[in-house]
From Swiss-Prot:
It is found in: Cell membrane. Pfam families: Pmp3. The chain crosses the membrane at residues 3-23, 31-51. PANTHER family: HYDROPHOBIC PROTEIN RCI2 LOW TEMPERATURE AND SALT RESPONSIVE PROTEIN LTI6 -RELATED, UPF0057 MEMBRANE PROTEIN ZK632.10-RELATED. Plays a role in the regulation of membrane potential. Could mediate a proton leak. Its main location: membrane. This is Plasma membrane proteolipid 3. It comes from the Eukaryota. It is a multi-pass membrane protein. Belongs to the UPF0057 (PMP3) family. One of its GO terms (cellular component) is plasma membrane. Keywords: Cell membrane, Membrane, Transmembrane, Transmembrane helix. GO terms for biological process: monoatomic cation transport; regulation of membrane potential.
Length: 55
């Protein structure tokens, strides 16, 4: 696990949309994570962790 992935994991805990943006760019995944984070922070964080760990 390199340092960029560790930083993305930490970002996914505190700023989930930023972590998804860095992992996948601006697209459907980022929009879904923004919506999940606005509705409730915890689902947005879990989705961001899923995206970051999947790559």
């Amino acid at each position: 696990m390199d340092s960029a992935k560790i930083i993305n994991i930490i970002l996914s805990l505190f700023l989930p949309p930023v972590a998804v943006f860095l992992a996948r760019g601006w697209g459907t995944d980022c929009i879904v994570d923004i919506i999940l984070t606005i509705l409730a922070w915890f689902p947005g964080m879990l989705y961001a962790l899923y995206i970051v760990l999947q790559d």
